[in-house]
A protein has these predicted regions:
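Short, hinge-like loop/turn segments at secondary-structure boundaries
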Residues: 52-56, 92-94, 136-138
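Active-site neighborhoods of divalent-metal-dependent phosphate/nucleic-acid chemistry enzymes
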Residues: 3, 47-50, 74-119
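Residues that scaffold the ATP/ADP-binding catalytic core of kinase and kinase-like folds
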Residues: 14-15, 48, 86, 129, ...
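Short, well-structured N-terminal submotif of metal-dependent ribonuclease cores
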Residues: 1-37, 50-66
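Acidic, PIN/NYN-like endoribonuclease modules and their adjacent C-terminal/linker elements
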Residues: 2, 108, 112-139
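A generic structural signal for short hydrophobic patches within well-formed alpha-helices
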Residues: 12, 42-45, 83, 126
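Residues at the C-termini of beta-strands that transition into short coil/loop
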Residues: 39-41, 79, 122, 138
Length: 139
C-alpha cells in the first residue's frame, strides 16, 4: 500500500484516550499502512509526554510512542522541499493578513509536498493553505 494520509497530533493521540472516538479508531484500522506523520507532530507528541511528571500515564504514553507510533508509522521529515513550500505559502498567507501557527504550517507543508491528505480534528487551523487536502476523521 502507498501512503495517502498525514496524521496530525490530535489523531495520533486519540488511541491513548480512555474513551477513544470510535470513528477515528475505525479509520486508523481501515487505513493501516496508508498513514504517516511528520517530524513536527513527533516533536509535539514527545514534548507533551516529556512535560508530564514521572507517572504511570507518562510511561504508558512513552511506550505508545516508542513501540507503536515509531515502529509502525513512517515519520516524514520537514525537509528543504517542505521548507520551500512553507516559506512561499506563509508569505502568501501573511500578505492576506493571516498568521497560521508555525508548527501547523510545517505540518501542512509536509503533507502538501508528499501529496498526502492531512487528517486532523482542527480543520480550521489549516484553512487558507493553498490546495491542501484536509479531512476530519472525528466527523
Amino acid at each position: 500500500m502507498s501512503l495517502r494520509f498525514l496524521l496530525d497530533t490530535n489523531i495520533l493521540s486519540e488511541p491513548t484516550r480512555q474513551h477513544p472516538h470510535p470513528v477515528v479508531m475505525k479509520k486508523l484500522q481501515e487505513h493501516e499502512g496508508e498513514v504517516a506523520t511528520s517530524t513536527t507532530v513527533w516533536h509535539e507528541l514527545r514534548f507533551g509526554c516529556s512535560r508530564l511528571p514521572d507517572s504511570q500515564k507518562r510511561r504508558f504514553l512513552e511506550r505508545y510512542l516508542t513501540q507503536i507510533v515509531r515502529l509502525t508509522i513512517p515519520i516524514l521529515p520537514y525537509d528543504v522541499e517542505a521548507a520551500t513550500w512553507h516559506g512561499v505559502e506563509r508569505a502568501r498567507l501573511m500578505g492576506m493578513g493571516k498568521t497560521p501557527s508555525f508548527p501547523d504550517s510545517q505540518i501542512a507543508a509536509v503533507a502538501k509536498v508528499n501529496h498526502l491528505i492531512l487528517v486532523t480534528n482542527n480543520v480550521s487551523d489549516y484553512q487558507g493553505f493553498f490546495d491542501l487536502d484536509v479531512q476530519n476523521w472525528f466527523q
